[in-house]
Amino acid sequence: MSDDDKRHMELARLLVSLFPGRKLNGFLVGLLHSLSGRYRLPKELRGDRVPSSSKLARFIGTLDRERHIHSYFWDLLRRERPSRVGDIDRVARLWEEEGHWKGLESLRFPAGEVFPQVARGSSDNNGAPPLSFTLSHGDPKSDPEPSSPSRLVNTGLSEAERPESPLASDQCLVTSHAYFFWLEVGAWIEGSIEDEPVSLPEDLPSGARLRVVLFSSPGGLVLQPDADQGVLCIEGDGRVVVERPACVPPALQSRELADRRLFFPLRTPQAPGTYRLRCNIHHEGLLVQSRDVVLTVAEQPQRQSEALRSRVDYALSQTLSPTHLRQLGSATLSVLLNDDDWGTHGFRFVGGDDYRSSVHLDDAMLQEMISLARGAFRRASWGSKERYEALPSRPPYRYQGAQSEARLREDLVMMARIGRQLYDRVAEQLGQGADGADALRERMRLPGHIQLALKQGARHLVPISIFYDHRLDVALKDFTLCEAFIRASVASEPLEKSPCFQGDCPHREDRDVVCPSGFWGFRHTLALPFGMAAQGERGLMDLPGVLRIRDTPALLIAVSEDPDFVLRDNHLMRLQAMSGVAPIQVARSREKALELLRQQGSHLVYFYCHGGVDAETRAPFLQVGPLTDPYIFRDTLRVYDIRWRDPAPHPLVFINGCHTTELEPEQAIELVSGFVERAGAAGVIGTEVTIFEPLAVGFASRFMDAFLRRRLSLGASVREARLGILQHDFNPLGLVYLPFALSSLHLAGEASEGTSVAGGAGALVTPPA
């Protein structure tokens, strides 16, 4: 064993003896927080179980190699365990003897203070000189504390009679009893049930507000309706305090505790079992973190490993840093689909003015909603609700050729009937029946931003773009098309500026008139950003809201050489002629595509290709280059080390793909998420159903002009492309495009602050001759 290994093992054994059980986890989490969030605690060191000394020693070796085992570390240990100073100094001397404290004058600690000298006082009884620090500005401190308080997010449970005393994570709750779920941001709290505590950054601006909202499932834990949300605020001194409590426990003896800890009253059900809470943190209406809280309820008090636990399973921002929070933008309505343990799905709605509600659908109803929506898109595209490849003959693309008002009316009526039924199924379960549906309808009348949050392991993509909320009698047979829309479509002004799409359609209350502005996907900007919590492949990368450019954005295009793509070459020529874009790189083979993907610097990666599902492995793929070239799978990204790393841009990936075996979004999600989680993309654009080449070219051209040349946000660019196709081609199928990214994602110069601006791999088939 080398001298380094011996030092690491000695320190590991010391830490195990200093911090028994979960206390070791708390110390390590606090230590990593002091290192500005650069490291994550390995899985084997999390939880209540004491890790082996060898595993802990390996982690210490990582810190040692980065020069983090220095005087500040040992001083922290002395403060934490003053009764064990002798043991601490004995191990510390192993580092001092090897000269590991040299060069401390160059260290900058998280508080932002430089320690140019290590001043030594008189020796203690153990012969080791205690350390004191002299700050660069000449203000000596014998026992320095960070200038900013810790900002770990702690959650836990306490009994209603003793709200200030956290329950241990191995303590089961008891049936039919009252408790408090609590959340506090600060130093590590004994009794916190977080699997992996997430820290708020030290530089959150004064006045920043975080809204914490709790949800439960029917038949489970009972929340108090008027005490299920609270607000935290960042004070000028950096502390995180309660601005608006959810509830102040009557038995709470410490008013000071109520000023920093949110308490949410709950009652356990009569039956023992495992129950869940959903704890959401919102900033400016946008869901930025969500926790799955799992609680074990027993008939009698008892101990059980991990009886109480909280796990972050959705996080647009791991760090909640102010810069990143500003990039995320805002949301008028945030919707999280949450699977529970009984085969049902909970929609968690959160909006402004304290709006929050839940809808619960069983699996069969949700699947039917998805099938109805995709069937409507298929009927509009090729005249049948069946999948394209399942048909005995290949029907033509219905929107080939000149625009037709009659065809558009037929398809909009068909889609509106389905969209209205889907909207009613969700809206009328919002807690107040028809009143709940009307309240949501009025809330969403004006154009806004809708976030459909895709948490880890999402299996369903809810078709909210087809939701239709104008007052429509779906039983009628004869409908007319809104004449205000017809007039606006032939005007020079873009549709998004017309009264209908600003929430003022004159036929909004008419039961026999259909207007495309009634569809959420036309009136609002929609986005489905991945929450990447606990996705180890991409480390600590926050989902970016800004793509930095120096002069012009860089575009990489990978194309299929299928000769049936008759619009491809002209499409590429038009993109290459687009002003304000750097020279475009084009890959016409798989080998070249992988080579260019490995390079750093692209802001948008565009696949104009085939795709599908492999017959043997059922894995989704993309096919570029000659038809004889091998496929690109999710694993291909790892095999070829395709990963976009800072400081290079994390590009947006646009998949305009076709396949002979239709790739449904639930299958495509594996490939789509791979570009985000494994390769580090900012997001992905895909489609709900098979698309034809004219639609692919029309949508992509409009989107890229808005996103790359005019630098609108992704959400605004997608909406503009949808409405452009609707206005100029009388084609509603722009609704099939899905943006798996932040709606606020946009291009910005390197000197820009990056504040937000305005505003599934699908299938592409060539129309039969």
Curated annotation (Swiss-Prot):
This is Probable protease Ga0334635_1659. The keyword Protease applies. The keyword Transmembrane does not apply. It is an enzyme of class 3 (hydrolase). Residues 118-167 are annotated as: Disordered. Keywords: Antiviral defense, Hydrolase, Protease. It comes from Vitiosangium sp. (strain GDMCC 1.1324). Its EC number is 3.4.-.-. The lineage of its organism: Bacteria, Pseudomonadati, Myxococcota, Myxococcia, Myxococcales. One of its GO terms (molecular function) is peptidase activity. One of its GO terms (biological process) is proteolysis. Pfam families: CHAT. Probably a dedicated protease for substrate gasdermin bGSDM; cleaves the bGSDM precursor, releasing the pore-forming moiety, which integrates into the membrane and triggers cell death. Involved in defense against bacteriophages. Expression of gasdermin bGSDM and this neighboring protease is toxic in E.coli. It comes from the Bacteria.
